[in-house]
Amino acid sequence: MDYFTLFGLPARYQLDTQALSLRFQDLQRQYHPDKFASGSQAEQLAAVQQSATINQAWQTLRHPLMRAEYLLSLHGFDLACEQHTVRDTAFLMEQLELREELDEIEQAKDEARLESFIKRVKKMFDTRHQLMVEQLDNETWDAAADTVRKLRFLDKLRSSAEQLEEKLLDF
């Protein structure tokens, strides 16, 4: 059973996150291992396994990129295990330049420049994210997979920039 079905939700990217949260709580109550403490060993094991599956499904569906990757996996694009990478050389060059810029910001300990950098990367991420949403809605799986690969780069870059921000603020 796929994670969307487990939560009683349609298999699409845009979800009702409140319904997702409520269903998670219901499933957790229903399959919590403590409810099966007096059951047989097989029942206890099944409850632990079901609870782990529910938790994994929850983590996957509530995180936007993970949800997109999972949805793509249901359509034959297993991005988590694939060896493919972004083939867009202009995008890759831009990523290298952004990484170099982040390194320069770190060396200079320039908080104002870092703040501007983070805003720019967030805007780039948001623009690509909106494109991905449209591609998933239109079921253009190849294009959506390519966009998700690019979003991974931007997500890692954003995370690195935010870690640097914390480091500079603690300094």
From Swiss-Prot:
Annotated protein name in UniProt: Co-chaperone protein HscB
Gene name tied to this protein: hscB
Protein family membership: Belongs to the HscB family.
Domain of life: Bacteria
HAMAP family: HscB
InterPro entries registered for this protein in UniProt: DnaJ_domain (IPR001623), HscB (IPR004640), HscB_C_sf (IPR036386), HscB_oligo_C (IPR009073), J_dom_sf (IPR036869)
Record text on subunit structure and interactions: Interacts with HscA and stimulates its ATPase activity. Interacts with IscU.
SUPFAM superfamilies on file: Chaperone J-domain, HSC20 (HSCB), C-terminal oligomerisation domain
Span of domain J: 2-74
Swiss-Prot/TrEMBL keywords: Chaperone
Keyword Chaperone appears in the UniProt entry: yes
Name of a matching Pfam family: HSCB_C
GO biological process, one term: [2Fe-2S] cluster assembly
Function noted in UniProt: Co-chaperone involved in the maturation of iron-sulfur cluster-containing proteins. Seems to help targeting proteins to be folded toward HscA.
Gene3D superfamilies: DnaJ domain, HscB, C-terminal domain
This protein's record includes keyword Kinase: no
GO molecular function, one term: protein-folding chaperone binding
Organism: Escherichia coli (strain SMS-3-5 / SECEC)
A GO CC term assigned to this protein in UniProt: iron-sulfur cluster transfer complex
